[in-house]
Amino acid sequence: MSKTDVSGLSQLGRQVDAPTSPETAVLERVPNTNAGTDYVVRFTAPEFTSLCPMTGQPDFAHIVIDYIPGDFLVESKSLKLFMTSFRNHGSFHEDCSIYIAKRLVDLLDPKWLRIGAYWYPRGGIPIDVFWQTGEVPKGVWLPDQGVPTYRGRG
């Protein structure tokens, strides 16, 4: 097993303040030492929070990000800090969800990426947002995201 070069990272192994906005959050990447192999990386954020841009009230989501890396992997501490940066950020559910996915695509240029953002109800209506870069490459095992649609007490 080869060792990953982490010399260019600015956050891993250091105490870092949470970014004040998603736009200023620094996402970092590391080389993928298995770049010749297609495999799925999954990140799950079951307690994602942001703010409603109209009321300032908190919004909550269970977010699942799956991607097939190319030459790079997202460094997980930077992803955690990026996701945390939404806590005081006002934006609609759709905007948050797609922004997260596109920032990762811009950073990583993955072979494939999808996001499932399962937002908890506000005003009685749950909003789920799904986006992916294209068809899943053949031969890749892609498990279900495992988040049931919202049923309330039903």
UniProtKB/Swiss-Prot annotation:
According to the record, the residues making up region (Disordered) are 1-24
- List ligand-binding residues for substrate: V74, E75, S76, H93, E94
Q: What is the disulfide pattern of this chain?
A: none
Asked whether the keyword Ligase is assigned, the reply is: no
Which top class of enzyme applies to this chain?
Answer: oxidoreductase
Location of the protein in the cell: Cytoplasm
Keywords, sorted A to Z? Cytoplasm, NADP, Oxidoreductase, Queuosine biosynthesis
Q: In which pathway does it act?
A: tRNA modification; tRNA-queuosine biosynthesis
Q: Where is the active site?
A: C52, D59
Is Transport a UniProt keyword of this protein? no
Which E.C. number(s) belong to this protein? 1.7.1.13
Q: Cellular component GO terms, alphabetically? A: cytoplasm
Biased composition (Polar residues) is annotated at 1-13
One Gene Ontology term from the biological process aspect of the record: tRNA modification
- Reactions that this protein is recorded to catalyse: 7-aminomethyl-7-carbaguanine + 2 NADP(+) = 7-cyano-7-deazaguanine + 2 NADPH + 3 H(+)
Q: Name one GO molecular function term.
A: preQ1 synthase activity
Alphabetized NCBIfam families for the sequence? QueF-II
Spell out the HAMAP family in the cross-references: QueF_type1 (MF_00818)
The similarity annotation says: Belongs to the GTP cyclohydrolase I family. QueF type 1 subfamily.
Q: Function, please?
A: Catalyzes the NADPH-dependent reduction of 7-cyano-7-deazaguanine (preQ0) to 7-aminomethyl-7-deazaguanine (preQ1).
What is this protein identified as? NADPH-dependent 7-cyano-7-deazaguanine reductase
Per UniProt, what is the name of the gene that codes for the protein in this document?
A: queF
